Amino acid sequence: MSLLKVEDIHTYYGRSYILQGASLEVRKEEIVALLGRNGAGKTTTLKTIMGLVKPRAGRILFKDGDVTRLPAFKVARRGIGYVPQGRHLFPKMTVLENLKTGMRDQSDAQQLEGVFSLFPVLRERLNQLAGTLSGGEQQAVAISRALIKRPDIILLDEPTTGLMPIFVFKLKEIFKKLTENGIAILLVEEKIPFALSVADQVYFMVKGKIEYRAGKEELQGKKEILIRYLGVEV
């Protein structure tokens, strides 16, 4: 059963026609990777789902409700979390203060223990300025801030950018735990081997359109697909 369904979305930036009829879906407890070359429209897809950019046509359905025209804060309240590229932390605020920006009420504050179980290092860094953390620790704060709102799905834009290999490996474990806890993931990722290792379904985007969809098993040994749509050989 679909948790999130994007249907024939058309999105513009000014006169630039970015998404040209893009469609995809994410099921419950599923990890979906959206891959494509630079400028294909991947980030715009996430921003459109999140309500940060409004499409001119098409629909976005979430838990059978239409969220296409909702502002971003209402999309978040419906249960969609978002971790943008670059993390967007407040560097001169502490880790705890950054996490509090994702809280709505005391019930959200109670989610901190769950966050610490995923990222134990954050418990030790609560009073440290976010700008002094390592790249991996900053990403942990960004993901935790989204998880505090108890989303049903989390959108992640280039989560491995700037991370050391040890934390990239840690992310694999985190993703597994999230899906085991019922949270789906829609992932935009530049590290193709990482994306293919975690995703259940992969969508390939070319110039604002989804040109190919495949399950993880279908892509094994099919280098020609990666070369055709991404220009790389993994």
Feature-to-residue mapping (PLM):
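The feature captures the beta-strand-to-loop junction immediately N-terminal to the Walker
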Residues: 35-37
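Helix-to-loop junction immediately C-terminal to a conserved catalytic motif
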Residues: 50
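ABC ATPase NBD coupling module
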Residues: 54, 66-86, 112, 124-127, ...
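Conserved ABC transporter NBD signature motif
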Residues: 58-66, 78, 108-117, 214
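Conserved ABC ATPase signature
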Residues: 129-133, 137
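ABC ATPase C-loop
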Residues: 146-147
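Catalytic Walker B motif of ABC-type/P-loop ATPase nucleotide-binding domains
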Residues: 154-158
